[in-house]
């Protein structure tokens, strides 16, 4: 009897799944597909074609995909290569506490490459991908000006505390924070515009707001002293790096594909005002899909005005730069290299860079679907993020391990629990 087996069928979203088809005729060509809908009913799909071995089995841990959305041996390729049916959609789990992403795996005993040809699958399996582990708690935060959601691991603590910042997407994005909490960190997913009573659009980087958030987190009884970490991406990584430079509360910072200077919006902190460098919009390029490529608009070669460059040498903690070498939003490797060079020129060894060939801009937790481009509501156009799906997927797996290792090394003190 034909069977499609996925184990575990119920797991955290950052855990791998083993997929096997059994009971096939020897050398049978098959199609395996993955399908999922987000909370807005947007459909995402992937497929790959395989040949059964002499025992009538296809084990994705060993079998090489002959074609489809990827080729070669990629056990989680169906998850990483999920693509939106409607162009420029990004798969983001909103409700991370109450429901999983339900991914349907289907097995067909032929090559099914035309969407218009509908035949019933020979076997199916539902895989539930959760974003919060057992015992993780979520607290809605409205404290002073601070708006966000705090995720706490099970247990008494104290736990190493982290602030999680996303970029120009705005609002409150929680899936990374909840997964980190499932791994033993207390994480504040922090909104800073386009959420509740916060500014509807980003007009300035108010570092006093982020210091208020850091103080709130450190004052929480379940947060380990004396300092916190920051994980940040894109525009959030610009803010994260500024926090590392100016806030003594921050002792470990992860910057994912962010600039090393202040761009587009002024940075304000107490009496300090840093006027931004302006994006060179005349350098925007358009991909064949119509998505806008901003990579050349943030040219670090033109960063000749020292006050606009973030003074990384002032950072009291450690900084981990994670960069995708095929990032099409900005030249993130060049920016990280500039920051590393500046640290070295001041005799500092507190920075480290992980560069991933083939990875794009949106480096997220493992097995998150690769997003090459998606709609930007502020621009009113799709943004190009770049990357190769398989190389990007490998970067997500490796960087997630390194991020956790980095925070454990630099946030855990005697008496802390993880």
Swiss-Prot record:
* Protein's name in the database: Acyl-coenzyme A amino acid N-acyltransferase 2
Record's keyword terms, sorted: Acyltransferase, Fatty acid metabolism, Lipid metabolism, Peroxisome, Transferase
Q: Which GO terms describe its molecular function?
A: fatty acyl-CoA hydrolase activity; N-acyltransferase activity
Q: What does this protein do?
A: Acyltransferase which efficiently conjugates very long-chain and long-chain fatty acids to taurine. Shows no conjugation activity in the presence of glycine.
Motif Microbody targeting signal location, chain numbering? 416-418
| Annotated organism of origin | Rattus norvegicus
SUPFAM superfamilies reported in the protein's UniProt record = alpha/beta-Hydrolases
Please give the family membership noted in the entry.
Answer: Belongs to the C/M/P thioester hydrolase family.
EC annotation from Swiss-Prot or TrEMBL: 2.3.1.-
Where is this chain primarily localised?
Answer: other
Its taxonomic placement starts with: Eukaryota, Metazoa, Chordata, Craniata, Vertebrata
- Residues annotated as the enzyme's active site: 234 (charge relay system), 327 (charge relay system), 361 (charge relay system)
């Amino acid at each position: 009897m034909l069977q499609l087996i996925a184990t575990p069928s119920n797991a955290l979203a950052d855990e791998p799944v083993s997929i096997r088809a059994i009971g096939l005729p020897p050398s049978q060509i098959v199609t395996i597909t993955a399908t999922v809908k987000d909370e807005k009913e947007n459909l995402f799909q992937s497929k790959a074609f395989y040949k059964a071995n002499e025992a009538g089995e296809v084990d994705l841990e060993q079998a090489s995909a002959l074609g489809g959305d990827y080729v070669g041996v990629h056990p989680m390729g169906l998850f990483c290569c999920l693509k939106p049916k409607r162009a420029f959609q990004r798969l983001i789990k909103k409700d991370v506490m109450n429901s999983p992403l339900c991914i349907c795996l289907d097995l067909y005993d032929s090559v099914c490459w035309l969407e218009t040809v509908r035949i019933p699958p020979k076997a199916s399996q539902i895989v539930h991908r959760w974003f919060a582990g057992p015992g993780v708690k979520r607290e809605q935060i409205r404290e002073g000006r601070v708006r966000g959601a705090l995720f706490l691991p099970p247990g008494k603590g104290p736990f190493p505390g982290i602030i999680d910042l996303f970029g120009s997407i705005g609002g409150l994005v929680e899936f990374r924070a909840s997964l980190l909490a499932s791994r033993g960190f207390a994480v504040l997913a922090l909104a800073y515009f386009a959420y509740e009573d916060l500014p509807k659009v980003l007009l300035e980087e108010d570092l006093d707001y982020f210091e208020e958030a850091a103080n709130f987190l450190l004052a929480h009884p379940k947060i380990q002293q004396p300092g916190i970490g920051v994980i940040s991406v894109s525009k959030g990584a610009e803010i994260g790096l500024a926090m590392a430079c100016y806030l003594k509360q921050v002792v470990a910072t992860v910057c994912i594909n962010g600039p090393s200077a202040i761009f587009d919006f002024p940075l304000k902190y107490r009496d300090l005002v840093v006027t931004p460098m302006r994006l060179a919009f005349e350098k925007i390029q358009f991909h064949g899909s119509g998505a806008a490529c901003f990579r050349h608009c943030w040219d670090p070669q033109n960063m000749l005005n020292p006050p606009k460059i973030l003074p990384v040498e002032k950072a009291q903690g450690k900084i981990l730069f994670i960069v995708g070498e095929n990032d099409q939003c900005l030249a993130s490797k060049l920016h990280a290299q500039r920051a590393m060079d500046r640290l070295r020129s001041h005799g500092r060894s507190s920075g480290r860079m992980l560069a991933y060939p083939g990875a794009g801009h949106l480096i997220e937790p493992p097995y998150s679907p690769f997003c090459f481009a998606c709609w930007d509501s502020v621009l009113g156009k799709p943004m190009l993020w770049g990357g190769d799906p398989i190389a990007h997927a490998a970067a997500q797996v490796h960087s997630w391990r390194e991020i956790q290792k980095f925070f454990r090394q630099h946030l855990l003190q005697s008496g802390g629990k993880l």
